[in-house]
């Protein structure tokens, strides 16, 4: 069976570790997914992409299991990185791991959604019908219904597609910094939901492959 292609958008620590967890997922001792990590085409993004493609985890970590799992994924050839977002066009699954920044205006915390919304717009311009989009970023309540769905719908409509043509789900990042970082992804229960039942079911199948 051909491996499904998963794009992980956002190669911060969470995104890089999640990409690793997905890449080491196996069924019948064979990798389930081909994984492509995507980051911004800027100095920081290019540094992360280059490190990954050279076989180096892009962050310092004392989790030896994460380091070895990353090396294993690189050796087996199903984990790479790029700044070219067009690779999303033939993805089966897209994971959004973009950090939301908080600015303090007049001492009131305000979320900066621009980078997040820009990424969702680009996804809508690129993805094929039936793609599963999982928002893993920790977002405020209502973000999927009030930001993600309308943004995707606007871009899809320009392409003559309906929002019903894609599967939208949310499963917030659940990680524990330290020497068991990877295990905090793969060995703990995960909460998830879908915009439709079909999306929720697809998300459950994916998470069941990644989480022990």
Model regions and ranges:
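Structural motif
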Residues: 5, 92-93, 132
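Rossmann-like NAD(P)(H) cofactor-binding subdomain of soluble oxidoreductases
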Residues: 102-174
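Internal alpha-helical scaffold of NAD(P)-dependent oxidoreductase catalytic cores
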Residues: 150-171, 175-212
């Amino acid at each position: 069976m051909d491996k499904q292609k998963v794009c992980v958008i956002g190669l911060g620590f969470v995104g890089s570790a999640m990409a690793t967890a997905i890449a080491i997922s196996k069924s019948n001792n064979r990798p389930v997914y081909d994984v492509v990590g995507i980051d911004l085409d800027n100095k920081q993004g290019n540094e992360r992409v280059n490190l990954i493609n050279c076989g180096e985890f892009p962050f310092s970590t004392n989790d030896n299991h994460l380091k070895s799992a990353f090396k294993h994924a690189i050796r087996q050839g199903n984990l790479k990185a790029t700044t070219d977002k067009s690779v999303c066009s033939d993805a089966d699954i897209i994971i959004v791991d973009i950090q939301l920044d908080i600015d303090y205006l007049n001492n009131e915390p305000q979320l900066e959604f621009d980078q997040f919304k820009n990424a969702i717009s680009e996804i809508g311009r690129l993805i094929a019908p039936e793609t599963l989009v999982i928002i893993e970023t920790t977002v405020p309540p209502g973000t999927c219904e009030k930001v993600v769905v309308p943004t995707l719908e606007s871009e899809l409509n320009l392409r003559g597609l309906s929002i019903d043509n894609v599967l939208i789900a949310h499963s917030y990042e659940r990680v524990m910094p330290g020497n068991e970082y990877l295990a905090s992804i793969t060995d703990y229960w995960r909460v998830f939901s879908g915009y439709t039942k079909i999306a929720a079911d697809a998300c459950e199948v994916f998470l069941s492959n990644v989480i022990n």
